[in-house]
Design a protein with these regions (language model features):
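A short alpha-helical cap/connector motif
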Residues: 1-145, 150-153
Length: 153
């Protein structure tokens, strides 16, 4: 479905401006219901992750509640520089859709397996059994969190 030829795929690996252009290229392929943040916010997330990685000098563990375009930014960062990400979203269909998009676009071009980087949990992040507190049991500590699920607080 998202099988395409990106013009400068060899430059994406260098983590240059081309990485950001590629991120926006893939983001704009998403339907509106999966693309809820502006391009500038998506790029900002990607840049913050790059800065954080350089500062901490390690592969990052990323966490998000809700999924969508932010997932693309976080996944691209992990695909380029290493790392793991965890996403909680009660909409399992959305997670499945995003996994397909990521696999067909970013995964195919960068030759990475989405399942080795991204852990999608189709439950409420506050669930006592499978919510965010599971990371403690896994002895994982998040380096960056993006909370973008319920907008009713």
């Amino acid at each position: 479905m998202y099988d395409f030829s990106y013009k400068n795929s060899d430059k994406i690996l260098k983590g240059s401006k081309e990485s950001e252009d590629f991120l926006i290229f893939v983001k704009r392929l998403l339907p509106r219901w999966a693309n809820g943040i502006p391009d500038s916010e998506c790029i900002a997330i990607f840049k913050v992750l790059n800065s954080l990685r350089k500062k901490q000098k390690k592969q990052l563990v990323l966490l998000e509640t809700g999924s969508g375009a932010s997932t693309l930014a976080m996944f691209l960062h992990c695909a380029l520089f290493g790392g793991t990400m965890y996403s909680w979203d009660i909409n399992a269909s959305k997670g499945s859709f995003l996994r397909s998009v990521i696999s067909d676009s970013i995964g195919k071009i960068l030759k990475v397996d989405v399942n080795k980087i991204w852990n999608f949990i189709p439950f409420n992040s506050t669930d006592p059994n499978v919510g965010i507190r599971v990371l403690k049991e896994l002895k994982r500590k998040a380096d960056f969190c993006f909370f973008d699920s319920w907008h009713t607080l």
